[in-house]
Amino acid sequence: MDIHKNTLVYTAYAVFNVMVAKEVNDLVQEPYMDEPFHIPQAQAYCKGEWDYWDPKLTTPPGLYILSVVLKKVFLFKCTIPILRMNNLLLNLMLPPLISHCLALYRSDRPPRSLIQPTVESIAISAFPIAWFFSFLYYTELGSVVFVLATILAAGRGAHVLAALTGAASCTFRQTNIVWVAYAAAFGILQDMRRRRTRSQVSSDSNEPVLYDPMALDASLSDIPKILSSVPAILPLLINTAWPYVVPVAGFASFVFWNGGIVLGDKSNHAPTLHVPQLYYFVAFASLFGFPVLISAETGTMSLIGEVTRRMSGGTSRLITSVALTGLIMISIHWFT
């Protein structure tokens, strides 16, 4: 029986990660960086000490509860290497999840098997920041896994499941509520697009549809058209969006009860409006996504020409670009 090449690559990735994990545990035998806060908390829960809580911890106990579940199911011990292995297992869940998310965004067929993730998804899973925390006991991996599961479920129309996984993601990082909102919007748009496709196929359908032009063809003049199409689809939108009320209401209740977003150590984690963080994200994503952008069929020069045309192709676009640049500079000055 032939083994799919993606399965071989995925197996090699898993074996390599296990080898790295063993090396890390051999060299770093004591809790490292923030692990002195996370590991004792998890070990307390493993002992059934549910009333223990380290006031220095800033995130909810999702990671520690997951460790208790794995301990109960697989009879794991809550030693440092085993707790770190939790994140290694979560890392190995990333390639299948990313493969299915990519297929969803591209409207492609997903891999036939969970052990046949695409090579691209494996490369993304090895992204240095996420990969580094695969060998330590941190909240990053659990947060990413549940966020991806939320986006995938929402995009496929499983909104109740998406709301549940979204709520679970917030128990790892409470700020994941932003990703829950993104997943909800993405899932609703996917539903609207599927309805539009059905209405186009069925000539006698009078079902209202959202005005949703292609991003590359859209302009500022399309915004009023999009907004004017919303009232007609509002009942459908509410019917689709209601499951997400649960995590949003839960988050709002938490903030009210806690007196803020950060759970503990509030003196060192005061919330503030930091607009340039969005610019950092765009620059960071553009830098690491540049190889993909320049490898497109149209080529680098076509990309440069298209960006130039959209920024300065005509008086209105040039004025808009200058105005946005000014607003960006003002936001950097006042909100850094």
Language-model segments: residues:
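Short acidic/glycine- and proline-prone juxtamembrane loop motifs at membrane-interface regions
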Residues: 129-142
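Membrane-lumen/periplasm interface segments of specific transmembrane helices
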Residues: 170, 176-336
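Hydrophobic core segments of transmembrane alpha-helices in multi-pass, intramembrane catalytic enzymes
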Residues: 38, 91, 124, 140-148
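Extracytoplasmic catalytic/substrate-binding loops of multi-pass membrane glycan-assembly enzymes
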Residues: 20-21, 26-41, 50-67, 81, ...
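Short helix- or helix-capping micro-motifs
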Residues: 117-128, 152, 166, 170
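Start-transfer (signal-anchor) and selected internal transmembrane alpha helices
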Residues: 1-21, 315-322
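Transmembrane-helix motifs of polytopic, lipid-linked glycan transferases
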Residues: 85-109
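Membrane-interface alpha helices of multi-pass inner-membrane proteins
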Residues: 148-153, 160-174, 179-184
